[in-house]
């Protein structure tokens, strides 16, 4: 992605997940007050990097003059001015992260949080706060909250009055405390009240097991809940163990995975792919860059990938790469549809700013933003609990097992096909 060292993030979650590039401190402007310097630093980062060169069809320089002339008497007024300036872009992923929020975003990729376990997003079409995905085993998942459910209020506060980070902060809190959410489920007209008890949310991203339930066949199951800093290492370790245990094929579960570190997603794709393109990125100049697999895949055994409406961002990059390269069969429901990349810049006072800098396309140049990825085999999943994942009630998982043991899942396209499956091209 360039000559400078960059750390790839993916947007959360606050949990808002997408693809983020960490770039560190940037020089402040001179000959201004400290508050003006911070505002100008934020303005300049957007001016230099923002994907839309029209800045939502407005004069970005005039906005600079407007906000730098505003009296900025303290840091809170400066943050408010920056947030108002960014809001004129009418794009929810470009946003200010105050120091605590910036720190929390970093923590979510490596540690644990006390909250209800929801990744959230502001729908750019409705401007409504909605659920991207509940974390596996979280209070939110146990309560049955689903992707695209709208969050109308948090403890009685209308979410239309809250920023994304303010909403996230209200849902976090000490363990065993309660928070009330007013939820409008997709396809319904009457909101429901949910009272959830906050718990420590483990961010360990991988669960794996060998499934011997089908006679004569062993299927390795890997569930990846997010692309955190240790995701690649844990997936690689799980894959190595399952290979040693004699797995004949694999199910990679990306359901309700809202994304994570972009580099982790690319590295995990390389575990499965032969030499091939993983993803293209396109910046505001139209310059296209690509990430590729090096041809050193860890296995060439048949692979099925489970996806649903909560599969977003970096998860869609991985799923799209495996589908477009005919390496895997996708099973489940259409994915979320987030195809934008944000760079995360650290500001001079310890705050941060996320700026949408690029969009991505799958290896076959599909732009999935707001469209999602359609699986090869559409299987709708009735509501199940976390404990029922991989059980007979998990019809998507059972469909994946059927594909693997019935002989229609995709194996490494350049290798001999194991007896467990025959290769086919996705429809």
Swiss-Prot record:
GO biological process per UniProt: proteolysis; signal transduction
Top-rank taxon, per record: Bacteria
Signal peptide range in chain numbering: 1-31
Reactions catalysed, as given in the entry: The enzyme shows specific recognition of a C-terminal tripeptide, Xaa-Yaa-Zaa, in which Xaa is preferably Ala or Leu, Yaa is preferably Ala or Tyr, and Zaa is preferably Ala, but then cleaves at a variable distance from the C-terminus. A typical cleavage is -Ala-Ala-|-Arg-Ala-Ala-Lys-Glu-Asn-Tyr-Ala-Leu-Ala-Ala
Gene Ontology molecular function: endopeptidase activity; serine-type endopeptidase activity
Gene3D superfamilies xrefs: 2-enoyl-CoA Hydratase, Chain A, domain 1 (3.90.226.10), 2.30.42.10, 3.30.750.44
InterPro entries reported for this sequence: ClpP/crotonase-like_dom_sf, Cterm_S41_CtpA, PDZ, PDZ_sf, Peptidase_S41A, Tail-specific_protease
Domain PDZ: residue ranges: 104-186
GO cellular component term of the entry, any: plasma membrane-derived thylakoid lumen
Keywords: Hydrolase, Protease, Serine protease, Signal, Thylakoid
Disulfide links within the chain: none
Identification of the protein by name: Carboxyl-terminal-processing protease
